[in-house]
């Protein structure tokens, strides 16, 4: 048995090292790609300072802004379908007797939501106050990550399955961007994807932080009395957890308005899935390859990317709940050992009890969760499942309505 434990330690260390590299590469790739695209579309005033390794507010060159604005205006004017896209937002008002009224109505609602969400995203990214808040939150995350590394060493990726799901989601997001025939929904998907990518990178770091604290409590708190260094690190980690909880509350202020846009995607989802169902079951003159090609290039990206994004956030939320419950359990076990601690350091016991009380209050008053639409709506897997079934049922209802009224989309 001792031989087995001796073999397990290097295996665990090598796995931890590999997961540490994977976390660093994945988070760095997500953040750098998002940053390059953000700087490329010339919005906002955020910039990374490589010397101090933090984000700063740096106004863009006036000529860069003017040239970028001119190119954006020319691109919109050059887009032949741009006027047609704007007209589709008000078309049902003037054609209420048309056979395609239902299709036009669904299309108009989707267009109106897309225009509204794009305007909101663009205004936020150009707002100086929003930029400052975003920069402060990013720097808080960088600072917390550095503090935890200094105490626990390199952090490890908590869940490879979440990273795989993110990669699959990213591929369908790219396909969704390509599927859009108009420029405005492409811009909306791009800007929304930028913010969601940064939030996913934060979720990966957040999970790695809590997992590292759990591992420290699991492997560094033996049955015998903890040494002075372990007790000092335990108190530091509890203080850092309090900071993590406070930073997460600040991040939610920026995230909730964006999360509401994820829910508003249900209109586009219903439209895309109703077309997918129609093409699969009712276009019998088309071959399987023709159906698949049409669905793939027009509706598949928009039908799967928002669902996978919601599922990803829900899985992250459920993992956070599980890890915080485990952390609470481990702190309870440490609390039960206070009879041993009292023989060592009465000051440690008083500080630990105070920090544990703070932890219990934060866990109940402001738990680390992923909310959507409001602070009272938690975005876990049950919500993601409800979102999926709501999409499917409404899509089937749309198809039934079209069949009952003999509405043809050809």
From Swiss-Prot:
Its main location: membrane. The chain crosses the membrane at residues 18-38, 73-93, 150-170, 190-210, 250-270, 294-314, 379-399. It is found in: Cell membrane. Keywords: Cell membrane, Glycoprotein, Membrane, Transmembrane, Transmembrane helix. Residues 1-17, 94-149, 211-249, 315-378 are cytoplasmic. GO terms for biological process: transmembrane transport. GO terms for molecular function: ligand-gated channel activity. Glycans are attached at residue 272. GO terms for cellular component: membrane; plasma membrane. It is a multi-pass membrane protein. This is Gustatory receptor-like 36a. It comes from Drosophila melanogaster (Fruit fly).
